[in-house]
Amino acid sequence: MRTSQYLLSTLKETPADAEVISHQLMLRAGMIRKLASGLYTWLPTGVRVLKKVENIVREEMNNAGAIEVLMPVVQPADLWQESGRWEQYGPELLRFVDRGERPFVLGPTHEEVITDLIRNELSSYKQLPLNFYQIQTKFRDEVRPRFGVMRSREFLMKDAYSFHTSQESLQETYDAMYAAYSKIFSRMGLDFRAVQADTGSIGGSASHEFQVLAQSGEDDVVFSDTSDYAANIELAEAIAPKEPRAAATQEMTLVDTPNAKTIAELVEQFNLPIEKTVKTLLVKAVEGSSFPLVALLVRGDHELNEVKAEKLPQVASPLTFATEEEIRAVVKAGPGSLGPVNMPIPVVIDRTVAAMSDFAAGANIDGKHYFGINWDRDVATPEIADIRNVVAGDPSPDGQGTLQIKRGIEVGHIFQLGTKYSEALKASVQGEDGRNQILTMGCYGIGVTRVVAAAIEQNYDERGIVWPDAIAPFQVAILPMNMHKSFRVQELAEKLYSELRAQGIEVLLDDRKERPGVMFADMELIGIPHTIVLGDRNLDNDDIEYKYRRNGEKQLIKTGDIVDYLVKQIKG
């Protein structure tokens, strides 16, 4: 490709509304342009990267035995009504009617469509298992689109759906998809973790997220420093302390604390170690309980894990924190003065709290705390559960090493769905025993457009994008200095351009009448991995300057060797 026949569209300045680095660089590198809130046009450079991501995804899905299909973006409302998600999905589901007043949706996902297809196409267990995938546009009417294509309203996604007659068969496909996803993100040159994830409202028996590690990520990714253990923060288990509870050394004392309504204020005003404090949170009890609220206790420097807490049998779902009015109606004290002693409702304490002695907590009297509380002496040990977020340095749940926590961007997610959609849409086949059998499903998604942004968040410097070789828009940039004045430079540039293309290498020849500084800046901004610079001074010695974008190293290579050198660098 020649720049004279290409839309480069680079920007010198960073647009003011671009918050994260990927959004900034995608705009500056001429990859995307905003059309409306959460809607982007992909320009040629962006499309080239997008297609490379698509191709890697497609190759590995095919290698894993999945079959490609293509389903409509526009879906009839009756399928969503049949599955029950017409009411459940909420305002992110864009609904409209056609000229015949028939209701439709713009698909945010395709479980209903693929299940409808399968219930009409398959009739026997002999046709299974099957795994179908597509790379298709999705639309979710996000309330606040942000971060460019990281959280846009329209996006490209690879979604796959597998169908089975047994859990064992589903597990085999799930494992194959796990392996395929690992290959996909490894081939793209991304630093990622496959983490255990909560199945949430989708349900099912297993779920993994694939997280690209990046400072700008919205998720906390937890992983061991010595093993393969990894989970998202919601699911990571906080192990109980190994050391036995220390013996009591203090008497329980009622202390006036009128100005200490938070743990931070208590610690500061009374010079307490925060590890010797406990905070008490009240949430609504499950419907039908004999008590309206449940008290949850975590150590003062720990955070309640709301996903874990919601799974407690006595806690209402979704998790709902009690208002001050509701708290006072039950405990007769405000939120800043709560604790386990004389608590009139069920109490659940975290494993770490169970191992504490001589600790401070609210006295369930406004403006007062108890200091020197000890379990089984001052208050009976209540139910113990893992209800906190892990912190860096905690022991790994698999017994190997300690936990680290980094920010991550979710680029893929795999689920064992079970029979949620197949039951709702009555998708079944004749089983081996001749009876009707509801199908078991798995679903597997990759945010294709999000992968592009995530790759940038992990690969950039002060000059621009530093693409992993596998997804760079071009492999080689040829920068001929004063090409339009030097016949020798022009002739060699054309010769190398032809020879490299003949080797199957993607080349961008910068044949613009631009200053060298502009040419260098644009190629570094776009992030092309390999650059060769042709200039009369070096050619006097039969040399060409080569620069590798990732480390910035330059070297002189003989004119006759440059093509073989580049082929070796790119193809190995």
Curated annotation (Swiss-Prot):
Q: Which UniProt keywords apply?
A: Aminoacyl-tRNA synthetase, ATP-binding, Cytoplasm, Ligase, Nucleotide-binding, Protein biosynthesis
Enzyme class name = ligase
Q: HAMAP family under this entry?
A: Pro_tRNA_synth_type1 (MF_01569)
Species in which this protein is naturally found: Escherichia coli O7:K1 (strain IAI39 / ExPEC)
> CDD domains under this entry?
ProRS-INS, ProRS_anticodon_short, ProRS_core_prok
Name by which UniProt lists this protein:
Proline--tRNA ligase
Q: Which terms does the UniProt entry file under GO BP? A: prolyl-tRNA aminoacylation
Q: What domain of life does the UniProt record list for this protein's source?
A: Bacteria
InterPro entries from the entry?
A: aa-tRNA-synt_IIb, aa-tRNA-synth_II, aa-tRNA-synth_II/BPL/LPL, Anticodon-bd, Anticodon-bd_dom_sf, Pro-tRNA-ligase_IIa, Pro-tRNA-synth_IIa_bac-type, Pro-tRNA-Synthase_IIa_type1
| Compartmental location | Cytoplasm
Catalytic activity annotated for this protein?
Answer: tRNA(Pro) + L-proline + ATP = L-prolyl-tRNA(Pro) + AMP + diphosphate
Identify the main location: cytoplasm
User: Which family is annotated?
Assistant: Belongs to the class-II aminoacyl-tRNA synthetase family. ProS type 1 subfamily.
Q: What is known of its domains?
A: Consists of three domains: the N-terminal catalytic domain, the editing domain and the C-terminal anticodon-binding domain.
* Record's function text: Catalyzes the attachment of proline to tRNA(Pro) in a two-step reaction: proline is first activated by ATP to form Pro-AMP and then transferred to the acceptor end of tRNA(Pro). As ProRS can inadvertently accommodate and process non-cognate amino acids such as alanine and cysteine, to avoid such errors it has two additional distinct editing activities against alanine. One activity is designated as 'pretransfer' editing and involves the tRNA(Pro)-independent hydrolysis of activated Ala-AMP.
Which GO cellular component term is one of those annotated?
cytosol
Q: Which GO terms describe its molecular function?
A: aminoacyl-tRNA deacylase activity; ATP binding; proline-tRNA ligase activity
Quaternary structure, per UniProt, is: Homodimer.
| EC number, as in UniProt | 6.1.1.15
